[in-house]
Amino acid sequence: MNINEPRDGGGFVLPFFNDSKKSRKSHAGRDSLKSNRVPFTKWVPDTVSYTTKPLKNAHRWLHLHNKTRNHFVATVAEFAGTTLFLFFAFSGTQVALLATPANDSNVVGTPSNPAQLLYVSLCFGFSLAVNAWVFFRISGGLFNPAVTMGMCIVGALPYFRGLLLIFAQIIGGIAAAAIVSALFPGPITFRTSLGGGTSIVQGLFIEMFLTAELVFTIFMLAAEKHKGTFIAPIGIGLSLFIAELTGVYFTGGSVNPARSFGPSVVSGQFTGYHWIYWVGPILGAILASAFYKFIKMLEYETANPGQDAGRVGEVIDPEAQAIKNRVSFASEGLVGRELDESGASHVHENGNHFGAPKEYGTKRRPFSDSPAPPNANDQFAGLSEGGLHTDEFANENIGGGHSGEGAMHRNKRDSEGTLVGNGKKGVLKVGAGGTGGAAVGSTNENLRDNTHNN
């Protein structure tokens, strides 16, 4: 419950500035002024009074503090997330390497048998998946300076925020190593080192390619917004799991400068090739970023369309999806939800479907400036190669689509789910809305009888 209630006279109450003589006023419209929210409260003042110097200064601070506060919250969350991620990963590694037969005295170093490799890899992969899922709403759940650098390169993260997160990640790695060292008996066993006869150059490139795979996974599952983004942490965790299975024996499976730097600081032992655990992941992030920008330049969405379809019969317009992935639209803008395989594309404007068949030579792009066709709510039918159809987002066009003979109708089905239009009854091609277009159809809406307007 908010203790700072608004007052008459356009002012607001801050702690130690309460005026009991003023009556309370409505909270209407405060949600639109979230940038002026009183810190550490849920209340947004309608206006700000300048009658006293403390309130005037408070108003100025309210306008300036939000950006700083957001950076602070993200930095703190990234520190906490990195600490938790590496704490459980380091703990698992410590257990795997210490829980060895009594006659095995050399337990410090890289895991030497498949059981240890699997145990360590699972600890890293699962720890990343869980903690990334917890913290991705706050800071992004990156936990890795190389990943953060890659996100900055592709423009998914501001550089200033990236620097703050990298600092938090490095400190988090040190904190996690210190906590594990203090809680668990025995020497630190989770430092990264080369093993299996791996040379420094080999270790460098192993780290580079493993990091590139992890960073590119994050780009495609998290930076790219799609219907599966909410489960991206699972794929990211599995990506790290695979990387650890491959790299733990040869390099310790760092793929994260903070993961290698923290244990070295706590143990006070730096190998002469420690630099490969910085240079390798950074090169991997650059490689992944370059490839990601390359496929974005080629509009990869058009190569395999329909990957974000959520219903039977729904086909995603690949060109619209490519545009949607590059720019931000208003919340009500549903862009390019459907496209015939050989017909013209269409758009959503305020919930209505506008468009024209292919024969008219009109291939409308999302949010086109060209005028809408007449009676746009009554969707036009396709011609020889199929035109446009509707889906459940269209006003009064629920379930519309093409029949077997290409006729168009509005919200009319028989008991068996077939579609009726222009007095002809045809079989729905693919689900609700259909794809592939129609063989014959009419674009003259005057040919429809009253039955088809129900």
UniProtKB/Swiss-Prot annotation:
Q: How is this protein positioned relative to the membrane? A: Multi-pass membrane protein
Give the UniProt subcellular location, in the record's own words. Answer: Membrane
Extracellular face of the membrane: 93-115, 185-202, 251-274
Which regions span the lipid bilayer?
72-92, 116-136, 164-184, 203-223, 230-250, 275-295
Q: Fetch the Pfam families from UniProt.
A: MIP
Query: Which residues carry a glycan?
Result: N103
Enumerate the residue ranges of region (Disordered). 343-454
Keyword entries, A-Z: Glycoprotein, Membrane, Repeat, Transmembrane, Transmembrane helix, Transport
What SUPFAM superfamilies is this protein classified in? Aquaporin-like
Report the catalytic activity. Answer: H2O(in) = H2O(out)
Look up the domain of life of the source: Eukaryota
Taken from the record's topology, the Cytoplasmic segments are: 1-71, 137-163, 224-229, 296-454
Q: Where is this motif: NPA 1?
A: 144-146
Q: Which GO terms describe its molecular function?
A: water channel activity
List the ranges annotated as motif NPA 2.
256-258
What is the documented disruption phenotype for this protein? Answer: Leads to a slight reduction in the vegetative growth rate and delayed conidiation.
One GO cellular component assignment for this chain's record is:
plasma membrane
Its induction note reads: Expression is higher in conidia than in vegetative hyphae.
| Domain remark from Swiss-Prot or TrEMBL | Aquaporins contain two tandem repeats each containing three membrane-spanning domains and a pore-forming loop with the signature motif Asn-Pro-Ala (NPA).
Purpose: Water channel required to facilitate the transport of water across membranes. Involved in conidiation.
Similarity-based family: Belongs to the MIP/aquaporin (TC 1.A.8) family.
| UniProt-recorded name of the protein | Aquaporin-7
